[in-house]
Amino acid sequence: MNVLGIESTAHTFGVGIVSDDDSEIRILSNERDTFVPKQGGMKPSDLGRHHSEVAPEVLQKALIKANLSIRDINYIAVSLGPGIGPALRVGATIARALSLKYDIKLVPVNHGIAHIEIGRFTTRSKDPLILYLSGGNTIITTYLDGKYRIFGETLDIALGNMLDTFVREVGLAPPYIVNGVHQIDLCANKGGNFIELPYIVKGQDMSYSGLLTAALRATKNNRLEDVCYSVREVAFDMLLEATERALALTGKKEILVVGGVAASVSLKTKLYNLAKDWNVEVKIVPPEYSGDNGAMIAFTGLLEARHGVTIPVEKSIIRPRWRVDQVDVTWRLSEN
């Protein structure tokens, strides 16, 4: 079985191909092109335009890398949400067109679930507490009775969005990432004087909007490097407090970190220290799969296809607010 996955929920258009020939799952290709604004944030219309322009080349590269033609594909998996409308529509439209033209079955994939499943696959995690951390999501979740249950999440903006917005507003970005390191870390590593900023954890939920506002205000009277350091420390410590509470509640022995923020070296260090205190193991998705990518969509699509989860083209409607706890995780029922 060959599954082609299409990712287009936000700034990245990606195509990945996964095969399970001989009962071994292999990632054959994982091509992508990411939109980087020249200034300011991401405009939905710009994302849609970018994805439409790069899609043919990214698709062709993925097929060539996998040494396959489109007629070798058995299923097309597409991320239908959550995400940004104009971006989602490009991926969905391409998936529908390929499905109709080549008579290939369509598989609907939740973007967040795909981050989780590629993380479980690449790290060999069994039953972890999951930290899903990205530009659009900050979620603490774990699997129970056919669904991923959310134990904690942001009450407003996501951790990744908060960090990106801060470095952009103070003139450090774009680019947001330099040689694999986020601008907040590059700046924070030059600081060290802690500035008191809002620390808001309610149960296992976090709030980052107040931290962002206060941090931007603090740059007027403090060294930028010290503000960066303080923002990073407060933001990650809030997450760790919520994580500890979730560990106490669930009793899990593994922590799996997925999503773009998983690449942060500072966060990894804090989590490894937490793991020692709680006698748990921390597993972090490899960098090539931490950001948005097509391979994670293809892989999750393969899991779904194995269990007969397909949809007709007319029902492949994008769902910009599709939560991970709304998905029936049928493929995990057979694991228990």
Curated annotation (Swiss-Prot):
<dbReference type="GO" id="GO:0061711">
    <property type="term" value="F:N(6)-L-threonylcarbamoyladenine synthase activity"/>
</dbReference>
<keyword id="KW-0819">tRNA processing</keyword>
<dbReference type="InterPro" id="IPR000905">
    <property type="entry name" value="Gcp-like_dom"/>
</dbReference>
<comment type="similarity">
    <text>Belongs to the KAE1 / TsaD family.</text>
</comment>
<feature type="binding site">
    <location>
        <position position="185"/>
    </location>
    <ligand>
        <name>substrate</name>
    </ligand>
</feature>
<feature type="binding site">
    <location>
        <position position="111"/>
    </location>
    <ligand>
        <name>Fe cation</name>
    </ligand>
</feature>
<protein>
    <recommendedName>
        <fullName>tRNA N6-adenosine threonylcarbamoyltransferase</fullName>
        <ecNumber>2.3.1.234</ecNumber>
    </recommendedName>
</protein>
<dbReference type="InterPro" id="IPR043129">
    <property type="entry name" value="ATPase_NBD"/>
</dbReference>
<comment type="function">
    <text>Required for the formation of a threonylcarbamoyl group on adenosine at position 37 (t(6)A37) in tRNAs that read codons beginning with adenine. Is probably involved in the transfer of the threonylcarbamoyl moiety of threonylcarbamoyl-AMP (TC-AMP) to the N6 group of A37.</text>
</comment>
<keyword id="KW-0408">Iron</keyword>
<dbReference type="Pfam" id="PF00814">
    <property type="entry name" value="TsaD"/>
</dbReference>
<dbReference type="GO" id="GO:0005506">
    <property type="term" value="F:iron ion binding"/>
</dbReference>
<feature type="binding site">
    <location>
        <position position="264"/>
    </location>
    <ligand>
        <name>substrate</name>
    </ligand>
</feature>
<feature type="binding site">
    <location>
        <position position="292"/>
    </location>
    <ligand>
        <name>Fe cation</name>
    </ligand>
</feature>
<feature type="binding site">
    <location>
        <position position="132"/>
    </location>
    <ligand>
        <name>Fe cation</name>
    </ligand>
</feature>
<keyword id="KW-0963">Cytoplasm</keyword>
<dbReference type="GO" id="GO:0000408">
    <property type="term" value="C:EKC/KEOPS complex"/>
</dbReference>
<dbReference type="InterPro" id="IPR034680">
    <property type="entry name" value="Kae1_archaea_euk"/>
</dbReference>
<dbReference type="InterPro" id="IPR017861">
    <property type="entry name" value="KAE1/TsaD"/>
</dbReference>
<keyword id="KW-0808">Transferase</keyword>
<keyword id="KW-0012">Acyltransferase</keyword>
<keyword id="KW-0479">Metal-binding</keyword>
<dbReference type="GO" id="GO:0002949">
    <property type="term" value="P:tRNA threonylcarbamoyladenosine modification"/>
</dbReference>
<feature type="binding site">
    <location>
        <position position="115"/>
    </location>
    <ligand>
        <name>Fe cation</name>
    </ligand>
</feature>
<feature type="binding site">
    <location>
        <begin position="132"/>
        <end position="136"/>
    </location>
    <ligand>
        <name>substrate</name>
    </ligand>
</feature>
<dbReference type="GO" id="GO:0005737">
    <property type="term" value="C:cytoplasm"/>
</dbReference>
<feature type="binding site">
    <location>
        <position position="164"/>
    </location>
    <ligand>
        <name>substrate</name>
    </ligand>
</feature>
